[in-house]
């Protein structure tokens, strides 16, 4: 496992090991001022040194307004990389959780596991690495809340629960695609500080068994 806060280095790692999914806008150092005080990335490597897993977190300063207010204005800054998104036709819907989330808020993204490595799927690795990232987040960034977006097909497979997320808001984000009838639907998942503290007391085996 390697952890860092130099997102230019992280970008280069992705170009080498995850070229099909380059760095997304929320963690682009050309857009945001990212450093050890407000962000970190985490990668895991296999026995051959290849990157098999990524995730990252960064702080949003929402002391003056709610996450719902922020995302109504800025949800397009969380556009997924790859699909041909029609930003004008896309939308964000604030749920009751987002309307009360404020303060020091961490966005959790860049979550990826190499599809080619079937040996790691079903092993509980995502839960282990997710727990580790939350621990770093609590110690390094001390958030009041953590949130992220999960694609609907992925959340139906239970990823958010394996990571330990205790709240989810369905139909929170919809990315329309150019020249296609279907849209990419996403849930917003989140935890408050007390949720994080409680989750850390749960034996890991109870999340991955």
Please describe what each predicted stretch is.
Residues 1-6, 195-209:
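Long, compositionally biased intrinsically disordered regions
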Residues 1-105, 109-111:
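A conserved beta-strand-loop-helix scaffold within acyl/acetyltransferase catalytic domains
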Residues 10-14, 157-159, 197-200:
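Short, solvent-exposed polar/charged micro-motifs at secondary-structure junctions
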Residues 44-48, 59-61, 110-117, 150-152, ...:
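Short, flexible loop/turn elements at secondary-structure junctions
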Residues 63-64, 69, 120, 199-203:
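Generic alpha-helix signal with a bias toward terminal, lower-confidence helices
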Residues 70-174, 180-182:
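Acyl-donor binding region in acyl/amide transferases
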Residues 178-197:
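A conserved mid-domain beta-alpha-beta active-site/ligand-binding segment of alpha/beta enzyme cores
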């Amino acid at each position: 496992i390697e952890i860092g806060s130099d997102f230019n280095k992280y970008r280069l790692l992705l170009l080498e090991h995850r070229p099909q999914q380059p760095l997304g806008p929320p963690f682009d150092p050309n857009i945001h001022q990212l450093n050890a005080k407000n962000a970190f990335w985490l990668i895991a490597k296999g026995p051959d040194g290849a990157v098999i897993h990524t995730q990252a977190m960064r702080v949003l300063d929402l002391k003056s307004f709610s996450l719902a207010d922020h995302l109504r204005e800025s949800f397009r800054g969380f556009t997924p990389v790859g699909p041909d998104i029609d930003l004008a036709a896309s939308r964000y819907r604030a749920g009751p959780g987002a309307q009360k989330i404020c303060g020091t808020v961490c966005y959790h993204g860049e979550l990826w596991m190499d599809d080619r490595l079937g040996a790691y799927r079903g092993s509980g690795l995502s839960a282990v690495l997710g727990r580790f990232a939350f621990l770093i987040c609590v110690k390094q960034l001390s958030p009041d809340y953590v949130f992220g977006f999960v694609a609907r097909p992925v959340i139906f497979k239970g990823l958010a629960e394996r990571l330990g997320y205790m709240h989810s808001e369905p139909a929170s984000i919809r990315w329309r695609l150019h020249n296609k009838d279907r849209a990419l639907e996403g849930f917003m998942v989140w935890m408050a500080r007390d949720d994080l503290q409680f989750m850390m007391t749960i034996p890991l085996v109870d999340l991955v068994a």
